A protein has these predicted regions:
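A short, charged
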Residues: 4-12, 17, 22, 85-121, ...
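Radical SAM enzyme [4Fe-4S]-AdoMet core and its adjacent flexible, acidic
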Residues: 2, 6, 15, 258, ...
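Conserved alpha-helical substructure of the radical SAM core
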Residues: 57-78, 88-211, 215-221
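A short, flexible beta-alpha/helix-coil linker loop
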Residues: 144-149, 240-243, 306-307
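Flexible, acidic/Gly-rich N-terminal and inter-domain linker regions that tether
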Residues: 2-123, 135, 486, 490-505
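Alpha-helix N-cap and loop-to-helix initiation/capping positions
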Residues: 152-160, 247-252, 277, 316-320
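Radical SAM/AdoMet-radical enzyme domain recognition
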Residues: 162-180, 189-303
Length: 569
């Protein structure tokens, strides 16, 4: 305590100031500014200056709204990984969407569609074909709920879908060529095969479906129809290996996988990772995917995006970032997959650059922000069945440096044919053949990619190995406009715009909800038109009944419970 004196108009006043000790980490720990960016207020969406800083070996974001005060949020769980990943920060060639022209300065994220500030073309476009779902998950904010005030049914017509495909294909310099059908549950659309055929007619080559897999489990022929129409991959929700962590489709997953085996559809497991809910099962998810590698070619973890109003304590309970997930995977795979095996998504840009320099044509690139996503490839040792990450037998860093160096030489005027032959000749030097999994010839695969100037030969890579990915979509608490402007996962909409994921879903009142409501009808109108009730499409848990039934949880056919117990040990 110390005394402070000041002179009032009448007399000298002495006040005692009590020094209140704040023992919080925030006060005692020093912070170091990394960079400045812009974000939004989670309460009013005002665009704010934001500071990204390091404290206690973690990366945080802080912003102050003049009305709603300061918001501080965990941005990246490891400063060391942030530094490593940031070395791959590159800008793409941009995207010129045909229907949105901004003559003056853009006020990002106010004018998404895409605007001239955007730095990445559409790597994967999403189209929402319905907001109906056959499940009623308590935590889901998206599906249409009958009886809810203002409830509407959003299902774009076939003509609207075709127009959206034309818009995507008109994007330059890289026409959109990869589409994800999403919802709701897309399989509820009776005309889903017609929609897929429209996409193929408009020259969209790669089509995958974001689904819970229940319809594939219940009706294999419906799955076959979708496959024959042109959808060759399922982006399959899979949040854990136990019924507690994955009540959504735990019992149905084995049957959905059986259907995919029979019809020739590949699968990507998509776990939404929530701290304190299912982050203890990440290793188990990978092991269950390993048991089904004949059909499951990837696992793409998505650290949760926190929607709605949440206090800081509640956010800290559930918030998990890419480095946190990667660290848990190392622990839960007993060090078979380590934190050093992961690279940020834009690390593959040198390969794109050398192909582009050789072909003298713009090529598909993954130029997203380094903090958006990460990945690694793993293989299975034939003898021990342990995981073998690609980094164990490939000097990936050296190979990327070679690609970047040779692309610069070609752009500087070197003979591109001689240069590419030199690249191919040197590839073998980066690969340890003794440690390379049997049946895999990585040097040959990269040589084919380079000489054919195409990624088509990557297919054999997926068959022999499994991709592990991370994609952390933003929310209002951690929105970073540096990331948003580099986003390459987009939505196509009936008003013929192409909108980045982290604008479309992060600010739904500006984008997703406003657009869908404009092109919707009431639930009652839909029921009258279709001659059915909305609740008729709900899944009644047919594969979960009867303790001794083959279709019951933990059925002998799939041995799901047995495999789940193995996966968690």
């Amino acid at each position: 305590m110390k005394a402070v004196k000041y002179q009032s108009s009448k007399k000298l006043v002495t006040m005692a100031l009590i020094q209140i000790s704040n023992q919080s980490t925030k006060s005692l720990s020093k912070k170091a500014t990394i960079r400045f960016t812009q974000s939004i207020c989670p309460d009013c969406n005002m665009i704010l200056d934001a500071e990204v800083f390091e404290r206690d070996d973690q990366v945080f974001m802080s912003k102050v709204c003049p009305t709603h005060g300061e918001c501080e949020e965990l941005y990246f769980g490891s400063y060391d990984m942030y530094k490593k990943f940031s070395t791959y920060w590159v800008d793409g060639k941009g995207a010129h969407a045909p229907n949105v022209m901004m003559e003056d300065k853009c006020s990002c994220p106010n004018n998404c569609g895409l605007c001239t500030n955007h730095l990445s073309h559409s790597g994967l476009a999403n189209i929402i074909v319905t907001n109906r779902c056959d499940l009623t998950c308590w935590y889901c904010f998206f599906y249409v709920k009958k009886g809810l005030e203002g409830a509407y049914m959003y299902e774009p017509t076939q003509d609207q879908v075709r127009a959206m495909m034309k818009t995507l294909r008109a994007e330059r310099p890289i026409p959109g060529n990869s589409m994800q059908i999403t919802g709701g549950e897309p399989m509820l659309r009776e005309d889903i095969t017609d929609l897929i055929k429209i996409m193929k007619e408009e020259h969209v080559d790669h089509i995958q479906m974001n689904t819970n897999g229940i319809r594939h489990a219940l009706d294999p022929e419906a799955g076959r129809d979708v496959r024959m129409a042109g959808c060759n991959n399922l982006y399959l929700s899979f949040d854990g290996v136990t019924a507690r962590t994955n009540p959504k489709n735990h019992w149905e997953i084995p049957y959905a996988l059986d259907t995919c085996r029979k019809i020739g559809t590949t699968v990507v497991f998509v776990p939404t990772v929530i701290k304190s809910i299912n982050d203890h099962e990440l290793g188990g998810i990978i092991r269950y995917a390993q048991k089904n590698m004949d059909v499951v070619h990837a696992v793409n973890f998505q650290p949760v995006s926190l929607t709605g109003r949440m206090g800081k304590t509640e956010r800290e309970k559930y918030r998990i970032t890419i480095p946190d997930c990667i660290q848990r995977i190392e622990e839960q795979t007993q060090g078979q997959i380590t934190v050093d095996d992961w690279y940020p998504v834009p690390s593959c840009m040198p390969l794109t650059n050398v192909i582009e320099a050789f072909s003298s044509k713009p090529k598909y690139e993954l130029s997203i922000h380094f903090a958006c996503g990460a990945g690694t490839y793993i293989f299975e040792d034939a003898d021990t069945k342990k995981f073998v990450p690609m980094t164990r037998f490939c000097d990936l860093q050296g190979m990327l440096e070679l690609f970047e160096d040779k692309s610069e030489q070609i752009r500087s005027g070197a003979n591109k044919y001689f240069t590419m032959l030199e690249v191919v000749r040197k590839l073998k030097g980066f690969i340890d053949k003794d440690k390379q999994p049997a049946g895999l010839d990585l040097a040959k695969m990269f040589s084919t990619i380079l000489m054919k100037r195409s990624f088509d030969s990557m297919g054999s890579f997926h068959v022999k190995g499994m991709f592990l990915g991370m994609m952390h979509f933003q929310d209002k608490y951690n929105e970073d406009l540096e990331r948003l402007q580099r986003c390459d996962i987009h939505y196509v909409t009936p008003d013929l715009r192409i909108i980045p994921f982290c604008a479309f879903n992060v600010i739904p009142e500006w984008y997703r909800d406003r657009i869908q409501k404009k092109y919707s009808i009431t639930v009652e109108e839909w029921e009258e038109r279709e001659g059915e009730k909305l609740e008729d499409g709900l899944y009644r848990g047919l594969m979960r009944r009867g303790a001794g039934d083959d279709l019951a949880a933990g059925c002998a056919k799939s041995q799901m419970f047995h495999e789940a117990s193995q996966a968690t040990t």
